[in-house]
A protein has these predicted regions:
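Short, surface-exposed amphipathic charged segments that create phosphate/polyanion-binding patches used
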Residues: 112-122
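RNase H-like, metal-dependent nuclease domains and their acidic two-metal-ion catalytic environment used
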Residues: 1-103, 110, 114, 127-211
């Protein structure tokens, strides 16, 4: 049973990757940071999740600097918009962290979520379930994942109120993708065909993730 904890990184054979889904507004949305631990066989374990509202600019900088000191991540993938680019630039200015911007489009968002699904279905992603906090976060993740599906019009969409945990995890997973790993491209699935087709069935949902 894996437990979420902000502890020390393992010395040998493990790498760490971070995904950040920032809040659009400080008072409405959740700011989510997810840390993945990846072993030499590309097995991935969620080792830290920070999900909070009302996170100010400087506070978020300090969160990521602390995570950087503890885990020494190979990469931080940060979902950016016009305002978030100022944040990632400042983070680069005050640290030596490898921060990459992820400019979100509908297509790119769907691609990273589909690739997250592929890792789950292949048994490569381990969810924390070892204590109450870990179970709560995992249950929220499952709930968000269950809201994603391909619609009758061929669009891959989430219909829940929030997708911040899924996006944070999907970004961390995308950061960890090595050149040897296969990566699903939506063009290959014809998800954006004008004529809807049953090309791909989302495995998300409570029946798609087993605990």
């Amino acid at each position: 049973d894996y437990v979420l904890k902000l502890g020390h990184r393992k010395d040998k054979g493990y790498k760490y990757y971070v995904g950040v889904d920032p809040a659009i507004s400080t008072d409405g949305d959740y700011n989510v940071v997810v840390v993945l631990e990846v072993d030499e066989e590309m097995n991935k374990t969620i080792v830290h999740v920070d999900r909070a509202k009302n996170v100010e600019f400087r506070e978020n900088l300090n969160k990521l600097r602390m995570i950087g000191k503890i885990f020494e991540p190979e990469q931080i993938l940060y979902e950016t918009n016009t305002f978030a680019k100022a944040f990632t630039q400042e983070l680069r200015n005050i640290s030596d962290l490898n921060v990459k911007d992820f400019d979100t489009t509908r297509k790119k968002k769907q691609e990273i979520i589909l690739n997250l699904q592929m890792n789950i279905e292949n048994g490569k992603l381990r969810f924390p379930y070892g204590d109450n906090n870990s179970r709560q976060i995992t249950n929220l993740l499952i709930e968000e994942l269950s809201m994603f599906s391909i619609t009758d019009s061929g669009r891959f969409e989430g219909v829940g109120a929030h997708d911040d945990l899924v996006m944070g995890l999907a970004l961390a997973n995308a950061a960890s993708q090595g050149p040897s790993e296969s990566f699903i491209l939506l063009d290959d699935l014809d998800v954006f065909d004008t004529q809807p087709r049953q090309r791909y069935s989302s495995g998300f949902g409570l029946t798609g993730i087993n605990f």
